[in-house]
Amino acid sequence: MKVRFGKKAVVVAGVLTLVGLVLRTEAGDKFGSARGRTYVAACPAVTESIPRTPGPYRVMVIGAHPDDADIDCGCTAAKLIAKGARVKFVAVCNGNIGHHVYDRAKTAAVRRQETLNAAKVWGLDSYDIYGYEDAGVPYDIPTREVIARRIQEFEPDIIITHRDCDYHVDHRTVGMHVKDCGYMLGCPHWIKGGKALRRRPLILLMGDSFTVPREIRPDILIDCDPYMEKWCEALNCQVSQFYEWLAWDKGIEDEVAAIGDRTKNIAGRNTYLMKYWTKRKIADAKRFAAAWQEQHPGKVVPKRVESYEISEYGRPPIEEDFELLMGD
């Protein structure tokens, strides 16, 4: 069956396209033609214009495991905290499969303590672990409501989470749950006893290397270079991961042994951490160099960046969001 559009429909579509382009062009001057500005008119369900309540920004990074937020968003968190924002990290899973020697119970206990140590380094409001088992986050209504209730309690201005396309089932599931919450967070009768948000959060999707169905769109790029020392210090707290499990998984245990005393050989420790866990940050700085120059006219492309895509499932960004994220 062929579908035909009348002349009026074509004209209306053309006008709407032009209006969208005008809004997109006018939306971003200070940070060049940052593609994130195109979302002023691109969030069809969440188009609210409710102003921000004065006070520190609240940012909630919802990752699947107790090191996801640190690895992929740590430099962003360090920047925002330095600018006065309140930042909360979340691990929906307890990390109990993340070791090759410890049993599940011990792994979960060790990782909980490691996240507490990392939280102190970052200066987080908190580092919450919801307790689901690794590779066991259900994609169901009760789990979605657990996540939604925690979001409503913190009332974030911005949420950062995973994209749907990712190598780990927990990453995909958590990302879908957060996006599913997006519009519903403002509905008073959705969560029984919950606190509906009068102003829904902006949702950002953290960077990844996947290209199917498409690569991430670099709407917002954060310079990591000024924060790498703190990033290394925080990752160093998660001994079971970066010096044990992941080293074993990658077959690089000999490099860990070569570091020796990590409390003394800080340079060696940091070199090791950056060698293996900043590859994406370095790759993104290269592949998104043109986007960086659009967003930060006149500034040299950094060596490492954290990249984010603005999700259409959250509210549209406002000038304050870009100033917090992309401003000096």
Residue ranges and their predicted role:
Residues K2-V12:
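Bacterial N-terminal signal peptides that target proteins for export
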Residues V12-G20:
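Bacterial N-terminal signal peptides
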Residues E26-F154, M184, L325:
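Active-site rim/loop-helix segments in enzyme catalytic domains that contact anionic ligands
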Residues F31-T53, I191-K192, R199, P213-R214, ...:
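C-terminal accessory domains and tails appended to enzymatic cores
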Residues K88, L116, V121-D208, I216-R217:
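Internal alpha/beta domain cores that form substrate/cofactor-binding pockets in large enzymes
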Residues H99-Y102, R214-P218:
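Short acidic, glycine/proline-rich loop/turn micro-motifs
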